[in-house]
Regions:
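Bilobed "Venus flytrap"/periplasmic-binding protein-like clamshell domains
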Residues: 1-17, 84, 88-153
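Short, polar/charged alpha-helical segment
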Residues: 1-37, 43, 60-63, 110-114
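Short beta-strand-to-loop elements that line the ligand-binding cleft
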Residues: 25-34, 49-52, 119-128
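Pocket-lining segment of extracytoplasmic ligand-binding domains
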Residues: 55-56, 128-224
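A structural signal for short loop-to-beta-strand junctions that line the ligand-binding cleft
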Residues: 66-73, 96-99, 173-182
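Hydrophobic/proline-rich hinge and linker segments of small-molecule sensing/allosteric domains
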Residues: 70-89, 181-194
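Secondary-structure end/capping motifs
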Residues: 193-268
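Conserved C-terminal helix/tail region of periplasmic/extracytoplasmic solute-binding proteins
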Residues: 259-287
Length: 287
């Protein structure tokens, strides 16, 4: 998918275009809508591997009765509170209205508000991040929850905006929750994995290298992100990459983090993960 979830794929896409891989041939298709485009492609077999939101992976697994597995986490939390004025902590939001995109940003923020014992009204009037960016930049809302790179886009439109709370840092303060706010992942069709285990292993190796490249070569990576249609603005991508929490987490660490995160989401809205927390067969552990 486009946006942060796809950022880590940029170098792999460039290498594939340059013929760097001798045993695998990759074809990439950047999509914007998980439910309407990516999920059907996984179900129909039009896509073998996809970078998607972690709750989307759970939905795909439950909907297909195990025909999709998660390979690795690729994005930790990239949500922030932005607004007209700076705040020091969740306590400063008590009694206020905060605007948030629908689905995961709302669920995550609601959970953190509960954990911090603050009473906040969450408004989903601007359900799409792009619409909320416009409203924030225009001064129509006092506080909003937005992901990177949308935070950087908003700041580019209105330099007076204040970014106050890093929701990943706030999440990590909770007991036993360190590095479990996992918002993006890479999945594979189970049938493809079973038929081509070596190809999947090779992909993961190349993908991990790509993620590392993006994190250490932000200027070059930003250009590749634009070149391959993952995001439209290279200057924004360059500024946003260090704050996007792009990672490669596989194996038991991936399983533990995703299980914790999906269990929390299930407690807020089971429908957000496809009805139930996936069982152990959901996870590819490379064994």
């Amino acid at each position: 998918m486009n946006g942060t979830t796809g950022f880590g794929m940029a170098k792999l896409m460039e290498d594939a275009a340059n013929g760097a891989f001798k045993t695998e041939k990759y074809t990439f298709d950047v999509k914007t809508d998980f439910a309407k485009e990516v999920l059907p492609a996984l179900i129909n077999g039009d896509a073998d591997i996809a970078a998607i939101p972690t709750n989307g992976a759970s939905i795909a697994y439950n909907k297909t009765q195990g025909k999709v597995k998660v390979l690795a986490v690729n994005t930790l939390g990239c949500l922030y509170v932005i607004g007209k004025t700076e705040i020091a902590s969740f306590a400063d939001l008590d009694g206020k209205t905060v605007y948030a995109p629908a689905q995961n940003p709302t669920f995550i923020f609601k959970y953190l508000c509960g954990q911090n014992n603050v009473n906040v009204t969450i408004d989903n009037q601007y359900s799409a991040p792009a619409d909320l960016v416009a409203a924030v930049a225009a001064g129509k809302v006092d506080y909003a929850v937005l992901p990177e790179p949308m935070i950087t886009v908003a700041k580019a439109k209105n330099a007076d905006l204040k970014v106050s709370l890093d929701l990943t840092a706030e999440w990590n303060k909770l007991d036993g929750k360190q590095d479990t706010l996992v918002q993006g992942c890479v999945v594979v069709r189970t049938a493809f994995l079973e038929a081509h285990p070596e190809a999947v292993a090779n992909f993961l190796s190349a993908y991990e290298a790509s993620v590392n490249y993006v994190n250490t070569n932000t200027e070059e990576a930003a250009d590749l992100i634009v070149k391959h249609g993952i995001f439209a603005q290279a200057p924004v991508a360059k500024k946003a990459i260090p704050k996007c929490n792009i990672h490669f987490v596989a194996g038991d660490d991936m399983k533990a983090a995703m299980n914790t995160y999906l269990t929390i989401l299930s407690g807020i809205n089971a429908g957000a993960i496809g009805g139930k927390v996936p069982d152990d067969a959901f996870y590819y552990l490379g064994k």
